[in-house]
């Protein structure tokens, strides 16, 4: 649940409470987009993906990765993390990185402006890495399968994907082909 303060009209309350659906997420693969809910409650999307095993899902819908309409996909019961290029929360889903984690990372990590090519996607945003990490080495095998990219924009074949969350998305390292980075 998120609590947001704002300037309310006269005679109304100043707090809006929005309910987030735990586990509601969207994944983009090279050829499709899947919108689903994690079947196991209480698990964060990033944690489920890092287990590197098929993730059980329900209420799945699929469509092209270009952002066009989705249709029910009754046959989709699981998502393989290795097939996922980009994972992100659905519009009403929980963020992939908590505010506390992001704040801690911001203090102890080096910020880079990055452009990541993971065909057919091009992701631009901010990457927070440990001082010992080199952003150009992200194409090599690492301990983490997914990397959070903050303040992301996603292009698919040169066209901006409109329903990208503003806070962060997860990019699969095994799909990264090229990284261009500069310190902030």
Predicted regions and their residues:
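Conserved RNA-binding domains used in RNP assembly and mRNA/RNA metabolism
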Residues: 2-184
């Amino acid at each position: 649940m998120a609590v947001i303060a704002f300037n309310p009209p006269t005679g109304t309350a100043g707090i809006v409470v929005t309910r987030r659906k735990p586990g509601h997420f969207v994944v983009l693969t090279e050829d499709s987009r899947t919108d689903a809910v994690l079947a196991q409650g209480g698990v964060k999307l990033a944690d489920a993906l890092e287990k590197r095993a098929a993730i059980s899902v329900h209420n799945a819908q699929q469509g092209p990765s270009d952002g066009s309409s989705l249709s029910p996909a009754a046959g989709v019961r699981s998502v393989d993390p290795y097939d996922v290029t980009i994972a992100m929360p659905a519009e009403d889903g929980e963020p992939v990185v908590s505010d506390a984690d992001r704040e801690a990372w911001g203090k102890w990590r080096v910020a880079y402006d990055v452009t990541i090519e993971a065909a057919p996607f091009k992701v631009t945003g901010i990457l927070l890495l440990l001082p010992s990490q080199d952003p150009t080495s992200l194409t090599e095998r690492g301990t983490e399968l997914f990397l959070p990219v903050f303040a992301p924009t996603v292009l698919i074949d040169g066209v901006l994907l409109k329903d990208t969350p503003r806070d962060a998305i997860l990019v699969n390292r095994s799909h990264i082909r090229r990284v261009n980075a500069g310190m902030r």
